[in-house]
Amino acid sequence: MSAHDLKLEEIVNAETLRRKLNELADTADESYTSLPMRKVVLQTLKDALASGRANAEDMLMKDGGGTLCAKRLCYLMDTLIDILFEFATTRAYPTRNPSKAENMALVAVGGYGRGGLAQGSDIDLLFLLPYKQTPWGEQVVEYTLYMLWDMGLKVGHSTRNIDECIRLAREDMTIRTALLDARFLTGDKDLFRTLEIRFEEEIVKGTEPEFIQAKLAERDARHRKAGETRYLVEPNVKEGKGGQRDLHTLFWITKYFYRVKTKEELVKLGVLSRAELKLFNKAEDFLWAVRCHMHFATLKAEERLSFDIQPEIAQRLGYTAHPGQNYVERFIKHYFLVAKDVGDLTRIICAALEEQQAKHVPGFNRIFLTFSRRKRKLSDDGAFISENHRINIARPDIFRQDPVNMIRLFHLADRHGLEFHPEAMQSLTRSLKLINADLRENPEANRLFLEILTSPRNPELILRRMNESGVLGKFIPDFGKIVAMMQFNMYHHYTVDEHLLRCIAVLSEIEHGELKTEHPLSNHLITTIKRDRNLLYVTLLLHDIAKGRPEDHSIAGARIARRLCPRFGLTPSETETVEWLVREHLTMSMVAQSRDLNDRKTIIDFADTVQTMERLKLLLILTVCDIKAVGPGIWNGWKGQLLRTLFYETELVLTGGFSELSRAARDKQAREALAERLSDWPKEERDAYLALPYTNYFLTVSLDDQVRHAHFIRDADQQGRALVTMAKPHAFEAVTEITVLAPDHPRLLSVITGACAAAGGNIVDAQIFTTSDGRALDTILISREFDTDDDERRQAERVGKVIEDVLSGKAHLPDMLAKRTKPKKAARAFKVEPRVEINNTLSNKFTVIEVEGLDRPGLLSELTGLISDLSLDIASAHITTFGEKVIDSFYVTDLVGHKISNATRQGNIKRKLLALLGAENGARTNGRSPQAAA
């Protein structure tokens, strides 16, 4: 890369800047170290820094060159430090007859030493001395550092002589790595050269295994800390898996092992092909571009590509929307594909290190496994061998001779429980062009693949290796389209392909009984569907395979399943089941979380969709795996309880156990059952209480809860309390129930939900009942926050106290909400198009109003308040949150208990709710339906 390409003269003109400082010094009356002179020098350097950075940003916006930008910013810093150091040693603290000790080399180390910087990067400097520090040296170092700090730079520094550098490099791997990147800046070049020679002879030589082992272990620890997958949707560009640090690690170990100065030398040595070198350079350039843009956009050393800055970075890089994917999603997909390329390069270089050079370095193989070179054949044709507990190819041409071997490699690894030899993976990666239409339709290849996918061992591990190598996306091109695809929202934590692999991992854990405490129903059901277990694995691999297309991914995915399943060897009946499961994979979750499961029509409609117990079982397990694999914290006990309730209620319909008794008959039975449980009450008091609740209460609430409510209301009446709350933790369901007894009025639920929001409670469900004497008995469920019931009860009682204070007028709700209405920073990056649907077919008794919008503190209170203002009674509310998006369903009637059937009134309700949802919101960028986005 030439200076002409870099256009360095547009960044800073070194001679002009040097001349300007000298002219200032020549005309100054003060001492060069005086405060006025120091201010002048500082301002001159700061102006040059600001101008150079601005020019670098402008050039980045024009040419898009990430590596160019990093080198330009590094040149800017080199120039400023060189001129500053010259001023310090010739003007501020000159030496007329310097001794040998009054000498110094200024050296860039660490990231700065590698020759690339982003705007906010640390500037790591080594003040290299020939002997011990001198008073002159202390003055120069102090002057230089304070000027750099006052320029606003983050400077890391050390002052050492050569002996100290060598001793510390021997003891500390971090210091050794920093010196490996050492680059001369200014001062005594011979001194620096002496350090280089001694570092090579005394530190590097003979310690290659030690260094490489340490760097790979350091990388693994960093990945564990940042997140094992390279597909986290808010990646750390510098430290994350597949990020810049991984590229640095690769170059460190090759530089240390092969004694190279540039990546180009690795091609001459046969470590990388020219295509792989090009891949390395492209990955490096892209990551530098992203990181430089992040620093420029945020005006700080921002390394995490968080949701709130992703749109701006995507725009800066020039991404545009395509059908089915917005510009942010296209950018992040490109990012993850680059991260995957970095993983490929890691495997290639590790293979070269182990196989090409290990024999030259005693003990090198200990880095990877053991000295043992025992080999055994794994296949009759001798194509594969087991070597050090890893599968390897016996000959370099086995994939070309029989492309089915590209699938057989993974099948054998699974069957024998082997890791993969780097040489085999390198050969595989370089043979991907062999995967063509003939191989995809090959019956043996598909038989082997289905056995891998449905393996009773650990299918996720092998599929992950297939995906990382590129084989999975080539063998199933539809899968290849969703590799590295992200969805720009706060709900999905992983890319689509990563989510699918994690779904398969969850299913395998359920099948092995590892999740029986958390998922008892799924754990039981999996043992009853042995004949259909393969269908679940196939469905989980395919259920989101059509994401990123303009149409509903469930419908498009079902078509893909219909095409692929016969190829995998499934029968027509099995194909039909998988196709149905893919098409309906969101249905059970949607019904469980956003519909009233106490409403009989909800259950009957869902049973009509499912039709058979076999499908119900498969759909329940599929839904559990799908939700649990979305990301940490998405699954909770409340969702599990909703799914179990829906399963059991639907099972009754499908098996003929669902009672068709009239409402009146069921109401009579329920009152009689409660009367029996309250038999110790005086008859007059018992009869009076049984007359309080309306029919809907008895048909909805469990008998145990009815008994608890009866004692709750009785105690309140005996104490003369019109307003009272009660808390009950439900540990397994991960919710806490707060029951509120209060005089009924139209906006009561709005006040309760608002008070709950003000107290920090996250409402997931609400049931609203009134009594015949004009009171309301409302039950809200809030997400569990604590591990122990005692802590959770105290928190719930605090929320209940806030509710009581607000309802009694002791606290002012608007003031309390105002303190919590600022949305989360990440949520501000998103737009969710407001949506309101009014449906009279989902319930026989109620109109269902479903609203969707951008979540914000207090939104539920605003919605319920507006619904009350529109003269509607809310019977139940069901709250579902998908990251930044909320979908709330309200079961309502008018004030006389009728559905809302008038079209004009429906239009007015919809218009006002849309206006409320639209406040502080805009049009959603992806334009997907709520189901499609889930």
UniProtKB/Swiss-Prot annotation:
It comes from Brucella ovis (strain ATCC 25840 / 63/290 / NCTC 10512). Keywords: Hydrolase, Magnesium, Multifunctional enzyme, Nucleotidyltransferase, Repeat, Transferase. Residues 496-613 form the HD domain. One of its GO terms (molecular function) is phosphoric diester hydrolase activity. Residues 380-736 are annotated as: Uridylyl-removing. PANTHER family: BIFUNCTIONAL URIDYLYLTRANSFERASE/URIDYLYL-REMOVING ENZYME (PTHR47320), BIFUNCTIONAL URIDYLYLTRANSFERASE_URIDYLYL-REMOVING ENZYME (PTHR47320:SF1). Residues 737-818, 848-931 form the ACT domain. Modifies, by uridylylation and deuridylylation, the PII regulatory proteins (GlnB and homologs), in response to the nitrogen status of the cell that GlnD senses through the glutamine level. Under low glutamine levels, catalyzes the conversion of the PII proteins and UTP to PII-UMP and PPi, while under higher glutamine levels, GlnD hydrolyzes PII-UMP to PII and UMP (deuridylylation). Thus, controls uridylylation state and activity of the PII proteins, and plays an important role in the regulation of nitrogen assimilation and metabolism. Belongs to the GlnD family. Uridylyltransferase (UTase) activity is inhibited by glutamine, while glutamine activates uridylyl-removing (UR) activity. InterPro entries: ACT-like_dom_sf, ACT_dom, HD/PDEase_dom, HD_domain, NT_sf, PII_UdlTrfase/GS_AdlTrfase, UTase/UR. This is Bifunctional uridylyltransferase/uridylyl-removing enzyme. Its cofactor is Mg(2+). HAMAP family: PII_uridylyl_transf. GO terms for biological process: regulation of nitrogen utilization. Residues 1-379 are annotated as: Uridylyltransferase. Its EC number is 2.7.7.59, 3.1.4.-. It catalyses: [protein-PII]-L-tyrosine + UTP = [protein-PII]-uridylyl-L-tyrosine + diphosphate; [protein-PII]-uridylyl-L-tyrosine + H2O = [protein-PII]-L-tyrosine + UMP + H(+). The keyword Disulfide bond does not apply. The gene is glnD.
